[in-house]
């Protein structure tokens, strides 16, 4: 059973060091842990390629797809703009798929800040990759119930191996920033205009502006 950890794991638990994360989750019974930021790096490259190929020739703008709440809201309330939502798999799914390609019979538990990931993982197309989803709050309860004290966990191999851009997915605007950096690596001359919003109400307003043509050519993050 593998725990795959969202980039937002950093700073979630008192006395947590990245050299102790693996040992702490193994104390809960997990075989090992992987960082979802690795999947974020893969997602970044895919979205950068899509942006270069699609915008503005085929699509007026492109919106990132990593947040299920944002993606579902956009597709439900603005169906005519649904084609502008990136089709890239989320970092959670990409990370889980990497592990299951090597160990098909293993179980994958995603650990992150957002309960909406439970809904994403319940989709038929994703169930074969992600078996369970736990929030940080739920994992904190497991640490308490198991009596795991971070201070007592021995130092081990550092967990974080993904790029700074991949880990930056946890920060507002971090997804778009990572995609912009990837676009620049592919096409240094390409100028990428970015707009982002926090909270579903602000995301809705942003999509209304996009529908009105205010963000043509933009990379959008919700």
Give the predicted meaning of each segment.
Residues 1-222:
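Iron-sulfur-associated redox domains of electron-transfer enzymes in respiratory
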């Amino acid at each position: 059973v593998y725990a795959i950890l969202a980039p937002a794991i950093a700073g979630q638990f008192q006395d947590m060091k990245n050299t102790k994360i693996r040992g702490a989750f193994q104390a809960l019974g997990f075989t090992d842990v992987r960082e979802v930021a690795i999947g974020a790096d893969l997602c970044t490259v895919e979205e950068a390629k899509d942006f270069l190929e699609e915008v503005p020739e085929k699509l007026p703008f492109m919106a990132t797809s990593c947040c299920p709440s944002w993606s579902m809201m956009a597709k439900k309330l603005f169906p005519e703009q649904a084609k502008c939502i990136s089709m890239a798999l989320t970092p959670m799914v990409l990370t889980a798929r990497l592990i299951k390609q090597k160990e098909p019979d293993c179980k994958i538990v995603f650990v992150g800040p957002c309960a909406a990931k439970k809904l994403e993982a319940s989709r038929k197309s994703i169930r074969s990759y992600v078996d369970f989803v736990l929030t940080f709050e739920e994992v904190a309860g497991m640490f308490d119930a198991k009596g795991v004290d971070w201070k007592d966990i021995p130092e081990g191999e550092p967990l974080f191996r993904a790029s700074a851009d991949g880990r930056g997915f946890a920060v507002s605007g971090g997804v778009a920033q990572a995609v912009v950096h990837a676009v620049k690596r592919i096409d240094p001359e390409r100028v990428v205009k970015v707009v982002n919003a926090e909270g579903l109400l602000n995301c809705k307003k942003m999509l209304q502006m996009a529908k009105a043509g205010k963000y043509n050519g933009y990379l959008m993050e919700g």
